């Protein structure tokens, strides 16, 4: 097993579509898959403020987010683990950059999607049950890669 370079970690974070958010409260772990975007060292997620994940985040903001990827013939994998704190994003300019990045990742048309999505966020900023964007401010980003030993 080898450490990923910073460039390899960045590349994975920019290209992998989904990851797993790990939460914990009272020594009970909880992991849930999430789509995400990565912008300048920060992982962004969106979630509705309800359910088990929301209850846990209210009590413990320390999280871990993991992504992984196999090469084409499944003989080598790479993973990145982001440790940090999950925090709400309330700045509309930051939200707009997240929406744009998500739009690009999903291949959506910016001329219609961005305006509609930003209108929704502006209208629901003060609604406690509306979809919210969160960011993981990382304390550490680690990465590993491993080649499978075939035939040994």
Cite the ranges covered by each PLM segment:
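Short beta-strand segments
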Residues: 16-49, 57, 65-66
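A generic structural signal for nonpolar/aromatic side chains embedded in well-ordered alpha-helices
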Residues: 13, 56-57, 102
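Short acidic (Asp/Glu) patches
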Residues: 48-51, 63-69, 114-121
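Amphipathic alpha-helical interface surfaces
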Residues: 9, 53, 94-98
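Short, structured patches in soluble enzyme cores that scaffold and shape functional sites
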Residues: 23-25, 69, 137-140
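Helix-adjacent hinge/juxtasegments
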Residues: 52-60, 64-87
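Short, basic/aromatic recognition patches
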Residues: 1-18
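Charged, gly/pro-rich active-site loop segments
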Residues: 74, 78-152
């Amino acid at each position: 097993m080898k450490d990923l370079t910073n460039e390899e970690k960045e590349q994975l974070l920019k290209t992998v579509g989904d990851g797993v958010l790990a939460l914990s409260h009272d020594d009970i772990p909880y992991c849930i898959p999430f789509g995400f975007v990565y912008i300048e060292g920060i992982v962004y997620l969106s979630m509705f403020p309800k359910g088990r994940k929301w209850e846990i985040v209210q009590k413990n903001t320390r999280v871990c987010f993991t992504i992984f990827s196999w090469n084409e013939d499944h003989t080598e994998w790479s993973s990145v683990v982001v440790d940090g704190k999950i925090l709400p994003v309330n700045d509309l300019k930051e939200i707009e950059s997240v929406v744009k990045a998500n739009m690009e990742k999903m291949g959506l048309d910016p001329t219609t999607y961005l305006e509609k999505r930003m209108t929704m966020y502006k209208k629901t900023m003060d609604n406690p049950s509306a979809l919210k964007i969160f960011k993981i401010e990382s304390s550490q980003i680690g990465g590993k890669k491993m080649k499978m030993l075939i035939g040994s």
